[in-house]
């Protein structure tokens, strides 16, 4: 309530972390909880505000939308019916992951989100157990593959290029929960151009590059 009384706007999440500090997060940039302390953070540590000594201290981070922008009504993503019948599967890469053991069929599965590790890389050892081969298998079954957990940069590994060449579509600079939510919304809407919804911001979920 203090955030609203202070003039705060938008779809927000307040949470007190284990250090006793209470932050106000933009909901679409909330990351997964830290399992060691059960703390929540904002993507890029760009919080909307902090509640300190009974007062709301708004952030001046340039990567955040202004309160004026947050107060503007947004158009809906679809004019038709919206049912979450299409499923989105979430996978997380780790060194040595054998993708050949995974079988994703089209039974209500529309897409796979694969969370990459360091600088957007994933297992690409060749043979039949790398992510590129997994992408090929998914596409044969009518399932699209997306990558999350990466930012847009010209400096990428050759393995990352190989993954892109096998049809994996990157979702840049959004949290993993936001990436999954966008895909669920896209594949369960009446939109014909799903890529447009995925590449565009719905509600400020994409984190802009930090100004230098």
Model-derived features with residue positions:
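Functionally constrained cores in energy, signaling, and assembly domains
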Residues: 7, 86, 105, 114, ...
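Short, glycine/serine-rich, charged loops/turns that create anion-binding
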Residues: 18, 95, 152
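A charged, well-structured terminal subsegment
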Residues: 1-39, 46, 174-211
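Hydrophobic helix-cap positions at the C-terminus of alpha-helices
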Residues: 3, 105, 137-138
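Short beta-strand segments
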Residues: 12-16, 92, 115, 148-149
């Amino acid at each position: 309530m203090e955030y609203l009384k202070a003039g705060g706007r938008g779809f927000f999440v307040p949470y007190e972390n284990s250090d006793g500090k209470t932050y106000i997060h933009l909901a679409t940039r909330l990351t997964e909880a830290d399992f060691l302390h059960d703390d929540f953070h904002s993507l890029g540590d760009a919080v909307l505000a902090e509640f300190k000594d009974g007062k709301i201290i708004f952030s001046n981070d340039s990567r955040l939308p202004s309160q004026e922008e947050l107060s503007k009504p947004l158009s809906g993503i679809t004019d038709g019916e919206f049912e979450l019948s299409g499923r989105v599967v979430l996978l997380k890469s780790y060194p040595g992951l054998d993708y050949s053991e995974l079988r994703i069929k089209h039974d209500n599965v529309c897409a796979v989100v694969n969370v990459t590790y360091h600088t957007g890389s994933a297992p690409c050892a060749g043979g039949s157990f790398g992510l590129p081969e997994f992408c090929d298998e998914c596409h044969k079954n009518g399932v699209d593959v997306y990558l999350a957990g990466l930012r847009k940069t010209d400096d990428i590994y050759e393995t990352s290029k190989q993954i892109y060449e096998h049809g994996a579509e990157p979702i840049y600079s959004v949290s993993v929960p936001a990436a999954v939510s966008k895909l669920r919304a896209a594949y369960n809407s009446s939109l014909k151009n799903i890529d447009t919804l995925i590449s565009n911001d719905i509600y400020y979920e994409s984190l802009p590059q930090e100004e230098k």
